[in-house]
Regions:
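Active-site and adjacent substrate-binding regions of carbohydrate-active enzymes
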Residues: 1-152
Length: 152
């Protein structure tokens, strides 16, 4: 997917979406490093051999997303509900009997303040472990993603 994006800053957001949406995220060999391929050179060019892993910030970020999904019943089994949807931002809810996670993504180069009823006052971001206060709107920095687990 790194080969077809026109803005490389969207790549981590694509993975946040994949891990936040219902289903099992698929990461093809090399994608965890942001490797690019050229399909016009045929299928083998899309499956290069790597001598050693090329770990980077994207690799670390995908690892955090995987841990967040692994530890969350809502992200694995929860119902889906769209909360906020614009051309460049989305917030959706994943919910089970005992857990609610709000997945928030800002794909814009500008910050975005989302005003919506979160149904809770505080949350913990499952990606970073940082607390989030929903009071006064939720600030989404440019090119950012959050998995806010609402406190009961």
């Amino acid at each position: 997917i790194a080969s077809i994006l026109t803005n490389e800053k969207h790549l981590p957001l694509v993975y946040a979406m994949a891990f936040g949406m219902p289903g099992i995220p698929c990461i093809y060999y090399g994608s965890e490093w942001g490797a690019k391929g050229n399909k016009s050179d045929g299928d083998p060019a899309l499956r290069p051999c790597f001598e050693k892993p090329e770990e980077n910030e994207l690799t670390e970020y995908i690892g955090k997303l995987a841990e967040a999904k692994k530890g969350s019943k809502a992200l694995n089994y929860g119902a889906f509900r769209s909360v906020v949807l614009t051309n460049k931002q989305c917030i959706f809810e994943r919910k089970t009997e005992g857990e609610r996670v709000l997945v928030a993504i800002n794909a814009d180069s500008e910050p975005y303040t989302a005003h919506f009823d979160a149904g809770c006052g505080m949350a913990v971001d499952l990606i970073t472990g940082k607390k989030h206060d929903f009071g006064g709107g939720s600030q989404l920095p440019p090119y950012s993603a959050f998995f806010w687990c609402c406190e009961a």
